[in-house]
Each structure stands twice: as C-alpha cells, then as structure tokens.
A protein has these predicted regions:
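Conserved Class I S-adenosyl-L-methionine
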Residues: 172-265
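A short SAM/SAH-binding and catalytic strip from SAM-dependent methyltransferases
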Residues: 109-122
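Conserved class I S-adenosyl-L-methionine
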Residues: 1-43, 54, 78, 154, ...
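Class I SAM-dependent methyltransferase SAM/SAH-binding core
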Residues: 44-100, 124
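A generic alpha-to-beta junction signature in SAM-dependent methyltransferases
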Residues: 37-39, 60, 133, 184
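A short acidic, Gly/Pro-enriched loop at the edge of an enzyme's catalytic core
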Residues: 98-109
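Conserved catalytic/acceptor-binding region of the Class I
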Residues: 123-124, 130, 134-203, 222, ...
Length: 265
C-alpha cells in the first residue's frame, strides 16, 4: 500500500518543532546501537529516518561514510546545519524508507532509532532494508515495544487524534519479536534484546512543555485542536504521567525498546 497522503502529513509533522530536543532523551539508545554495530573506518552506513542526525553523527565520528535519509525536509535541513557546525561530512537526503532511491547492496550497515517503525507499510520497509544492505552486512534498529511506556503514551493520545488510515501498520509492532522475525527473518540472522530507556523530568507539566514544543506528533496534535480540546489533552497528558510515572520526587518514564541486530544472508 502506498499511504501517500499519510506520508505527506508525516513529512510535515515530524519536522514540526526542534526534534533535537527529544533525541537528547534517547542518547542511551543511540550509544548502544553504535557500540553494537561497531563500524570500521570507511564502512558505508545508512541511517534511516535519521531525524536531526544524532545517530548519523555518532557513526561519522567512528569513521563510517554516512548517508542519512529522512522523510521530513525540515529535519534534514537541521541535520545538515548540525553536521556543518561539527565539521562532519554526512550525505543527508530527503527520502522515503519504503522506496529508497539507493542502489542494491550499497551499505555495510543500516540503522534506525525509533524511526522506520513509524512508516505505515512494514513489509515495504523491511524489503528495502534487505535490498540496500550487502550480503554479510548488518542492521541495527531501536524500536519501542507494544507493551512499553511510549506505546502507553500514544494510547493516551489516541482519543484526541484522528484514526490512522485503514491498513497502516502499528509502529509498535516493530517492537514485537514475532513481528520482526516475520518481517526480517528470511533475509537476516537476527538477535533481539529488550532494554529500558528512562526519561526523567521534574513533573508531568515539564514533560508536556518538552513534547508539546519539540515532539512532532504531540505538537502537531495539540495545534490541531481547539482551545478547549487542547486543554483537555494537556490535562490528560499531565495526569497520565503524574498518575503512572511519579517516583522519588520526579517523573520517571520507563520506555521499553527492542534492540534488533541482524546480519544479511
């Protein structure tokens, strides 16, 4: 399925706000992925749904030759600015992970951190992963699990949001071992591990201020609502975190994620 209208909206939504503020809350995921993928000098590394470049920058500092692709033009522009400021050479491009304008077997490593999981056509995305990685090459993905804290946050948001188009895959299915095996098991030898990433802030209100200003899905949804409904969303958000995640005087949002490592057959 093409889902072109949804992806057009996603390309704007994900670029709505300074996403780099949110990537700072998943530093542990980026660090573990780059450590486990362990690039060698000159390895061709593709970072899919690269956002503002947090993973791409890490890979480039390790000596990889990095290409970063994201659906959102605004995120790519920020990523380019960040690379220039840091003196890093990274080839950033706007592109669709379901239909990449890249050669077969062009990359030693492909990564995505909480990124490709949001593409609606899971089978097309998995097919592109298998196509662009060379035989013996590696993939590394960090995907939020369906039982974890991010999925629960999105469930809290659901009553305020329009329904997804029919046939669009749930992003959190990418955090299910069974689903990932079904998508990638024929092409990759897989290793799957569950981990917990913690986001700690002083209060539910602080969490709201961060995500309603910087996280595309939350910011875009809030901006789409009238004043009364937006305040209902705001209050539901604060109550959700205060009721479920307050611990030792702060909000401790434990977010389970699935580390997917694979070697291309």
């Amino acid at each position: 399925m093409a889902f072109e209208e949804l992806k057009s909206k996603q390309s704007v939504m994900w670029g709505n706000g300074p996403y780099q503020n949110v990537t700072e809350t998943i530093v542990d995921i980026h660090d573990l992925l780059v450590d486990r993928l362990d690039p060698k000098e000159g390895d061709a590394w593709l970072d899919l749904a690269c956002g503002t470049g947090a993973m791409s920058e890490r890979a480039a500092r390790k000596g990889a030759s990095v290409t970063g692709v994201d659906l959102a033009p605004a995120l790519i522009e920020t990523a380019k600015e960040r690379a220039q400021q840091q003196g890093l050479t990274i080839d950033y491009r706007v592109g669709d992970c379901e239909n990449l304008a890249l050669d077969d077997g062009a990359f030693d490593i492909v990564s995505s951190t909480c990124g490709i999981m949001f593409a609606p056509d899971h089978e097309a995305t998995a097919g592109e992963l298998g196509r662009v990685v060379k035989s013996g090459g590696h993939i590394g993905l960090g995907n939020w699990t369906p039982e974890g804290g991010l999925a629960k946050m999105f469930a809290m948001m659901k009553p305020f949001a329009p329904p997804p188009p029919e046939g669009a895959g749930s992003p959190f299915s990418w955090g299910s071992e069974e689903h990932v095996q079904g998508l990638l098991g024929d092409s990759f030898d897989l290793s799957l591990e569950r981990h917990i990433s913690h986001l700690r802030v002083p209060s539910g209100e602080d969490y709201w201020q961060l995500f309603s200003s910087s996280y595309g899905p939350t910011k875009t949804l809030a901006e789409s609502l009238d004043d009364d409904r937006r305040e209902e969303f705001h209050q539901a958000w604060v109550d959700f975190f205060e009721s479920n995640y307050r611990s030792n005087g702060e909000i401790d949002h434990d977010r389970e994620w699935l580390l997917v490592l694979g070697t291309r057959r």
